[in-house]
Amino acid sequence: MADVLERVTKIIVDRLGVDESQVTLEASFKDDLGADSLDIVELVMELEDEFNMEISDEEAEKIVTVGDAVNYIKSRL
């Protein structure tokens, strides 16, 4: 199974059309990767599908950076 960061990175690159080099743990979805609120909702849905988990709206609001997403997923696997 691929590393969580690799899988999250692939989803971000595919969904947002950014270069893989831009996807760092510190990168903010909105500020650094140019995601709008709809992009973030779609990203959360794809992460839920990819990792077979449910992310509540309250938790999703706390996921601001790539690192937040990776840490959230790792803590629930």
UniProtKB/Swiss-Prot annotation:
Post-translational modification, as annotated: 4'-phosphopantetheine is transferred from CoA to a specific serine of apo-ACP by AcpS. This modification is essential for activity because fatty acids are bound in thioester linkage to the sulfhydryl of the prosthetic group.
Molecular function, one GO term: acyl binding
Residues of the signal peptide: none
Purpose of the protein: Carrier of the growing fatty acid chain in fatty acid biosynthesis.
Gene Ontology CC entries for this record: cytosol; membrane
GO BP annotations listed: lipid A biosynthetic process
Name of the molecule in the record: Acyl carrier protein
Family: Belongs to the acyl carrier protein (ACP) family.
Pfam families, sorted: PP-binding
Modified residues (O-(pantetheine 4'-phosphoryl)serine): S37
Annotated localization: Cytoplasm
Source organism (scientific name): Geobacillus kaustophilus (strain HTA426)
Superkingdom assignment: Bacteria
Disulfide linkage: none
Pathway annotation from the record: Lipid metabolism; fatty acid biosynthesis
UniProt entry keywords in alphabetical sequence: Cytoplasm, Fatty acid biosynthesis, Fatty acid metabolism, Lipid biosynthesis, Lipid metabolism, Phosphopantetheine, Phosphoprotein
All copies of domain Carrier, residue ranges: 2-77
